[in-house]
């Protein structure tokens, strides 16, 4: 009887006029059915029942048979009692009258009452929600099964809004596009690898700027009437009527959530901090190509720290690095990390490394980790480079763009090796475990893979001009 509010869409009439936005017609059929659903009628026991559980009220009738319960309900729709099982003492049953029959449900209590997934504060709420669900699923089973077939989601404006934001982002990114024209120096570098790798490495792929993000749906209890923003149908029940995206606030039926496109546009008000936030979620929320932390820190480092000895290898004071982290979490892009506030450049490099370490999903994602490790194990240099490039193409767009930008920066660091003593191998040692972590939290795996992590970052830095 767990009232599952999984639903979908039946035919909706939507204006075809693309030039003028028309609000969707919210469908009232399921709302009307909820209003018509039988109301719970508690059948009170006229006597005091010994050993009645403290969390049950006078609807508890003690140890009685199914036949006695049926007689007490008297054929009244929505009537209910609680009883203790004759066959299994200590087990409790909800007897409920619906559809001209008595339905019996095993009843549980763990601080809240439940017969399925939903937890209720009171038996009255449990029965009310159950009657609504039974009534709607009995009266509208076919209607519910067809709800997702003709969604109004596109017409509400989410997809249009997304396309506009992507267009604006693309227009801004024209100042820093992926490389499509090969200079003489790049041509010389490309000759180092096979023609197959060269063709793949220099292929322009606009999809990397079309950042897709899945919605982060979680079961939600809506206070007051709510309608699904995918199918436009009412979200029935008292609690857990549907799901809400915790990043953008989209409200839909659980069933409809399976059909929503990966077009989450996070709301800044819902993003509590910068550090420890999913990379794609952060860039979508701020409508940027890369996390602001990466851009701001790298600009500061390149402005005053490229010649600093041991750059990225030397650690800054932990307390000051935490201060930078808090500044970004508090002030966002307005965080002041200038030399006036943090004269030691190692604090800024430490803050950048900390950002990468704190990512829930590393820059080199868990999904691609083993593929990168396998690529690093290839002995032939050309084949290894080709394999690395193929795996790069599997990274989510925001992760790819962040990695690309970081590698361009680290290449600049190596160009100042005579001053900072940091070559690609040294940077690989620093950034290998920072940018890529094994999916399983195994110390043995981490230690075994460290040399391959280092090698991958080293390859990315040394071949930045042909891999990205």
Swiss-Prot record:
Coiled-coil stretches: none
Membrane topology: Peripheral membrane protein
Signal peptide: none
Regions that span the bilayer: none
A GO cellular component annotation in the UniProt record: membrane
Chain intervals with Low complexity compositional bias: 1-16
Subcellular location(s) per record: Membrane
Region (Disordered): 1-20
Gene from which the chain derives: CHN2
Protein source organism: Homo sapiens
Cited function: GTPase-activating protein for p21-rac. Insufficient expression of beta-2 chimaerin is expected to lead to higher Rac activity and could therefore play a role in the progression from low-grade to high-grade tumors.
Classification via Pfam families: C1_1, RhoGAP, SH2
Domain Rho-GAP: start-end pairs: 277-468
SMART domains named in the record: C1 (SM00109), RhoGAP (SM00324), SH2 (SM00252)
Name recorded for this polypeptide: Beta-chimaerin
């Amino acid at each position: 009887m767990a009232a599952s509010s999984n639903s979908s869409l039946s035919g909706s009439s939507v204006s075809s006029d693309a030039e003028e936005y028309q609000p969707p017609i919210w469908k009232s059929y399921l709302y009307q059915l909820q209003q018509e659903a039988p109301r719970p009628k508690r059948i009170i026991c006229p006597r005091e029942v010994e050993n009645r559980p403290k969390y049950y009220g006078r609807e508890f009738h003690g140890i009685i048979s199914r036949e006695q319960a049926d007689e007490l309900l008297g054929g009244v729709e929505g009537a209910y009692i609680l009883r203790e099982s004759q066959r299994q003492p200590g087990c409790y049953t909800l007897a409920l009258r619906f559809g001209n029959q008595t339905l019996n449900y095993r009843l549980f209590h763990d601080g809240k009452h439940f017969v399925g997934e939903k937890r209720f504060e009171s038996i009255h709420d449990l029965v009310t929600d159950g009657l609504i669900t039974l009534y709607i699923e009995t009266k509208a089973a076919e209607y519910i099964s067809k709800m997702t077939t003709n969604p109004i989601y596109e017409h509400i404006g989410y997809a249009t809004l997304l396309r506009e934001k992507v267009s604006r982002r693309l227009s801004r990114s024209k100042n820093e596009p992926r490389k499509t024209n090969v200079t003489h120096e790049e041509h010389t570098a490309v000759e180092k690898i096979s023609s197959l790798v060269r063709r793949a490495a220099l292929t322009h792929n606009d999809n990397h700027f079309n950042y897709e993000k899945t919605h982060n749906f979680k079961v939600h209890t809506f206070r007051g009437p709510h309608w699904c923003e995918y199918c436009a149908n009412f979200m029935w029940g008292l609690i857990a009527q549907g799901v809400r995206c915790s990043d953008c606030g989209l409200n839909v039926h659980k069933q409809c959530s399976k059909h929503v496109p990966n077009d989450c546009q996070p709301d800044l008000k819902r993003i509590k901090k910068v550090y420890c936030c999913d990379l794609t979620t952060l860039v979508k929320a701020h409508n940027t190509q890369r996390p602001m932390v990466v851009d701001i820190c790298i600009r500061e480092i390149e402005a005053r720290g490229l010649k600093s000895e041991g750059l990225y290898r030397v650690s800054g004071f932990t307390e000051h690095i935490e201060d930078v982290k808090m500044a970004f979490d508090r002030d966002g892009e307005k965080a002041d990390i200038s030399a006036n506030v943090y004269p030691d450049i190692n604090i800024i490099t430490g803050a950048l490394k900390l950002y990468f370490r704190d990512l829930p999903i590393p820059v080199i994602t868990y999904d691609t980790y083993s593929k990168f490790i396998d690529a690093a194990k290839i002995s032939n240099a050309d084949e290894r480079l080709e394999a690395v490039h193929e795996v790069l193409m599997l990274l989510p767009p925001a992760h790819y763009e962040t990695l690309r930008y970081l590698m361009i920066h680290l290449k600049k660091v190596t160009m100042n090796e005579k001053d900072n003593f940091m070559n690609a191998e040294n940077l690989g040692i620093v950034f290998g475990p920072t940018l890529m972590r094994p999916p399983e939290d195994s110390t043995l795996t981490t230690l075994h893979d460290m040399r391959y992590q280092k090698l991958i970052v080293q390859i990315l830095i040394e071949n930045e001009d042909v891999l990205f």
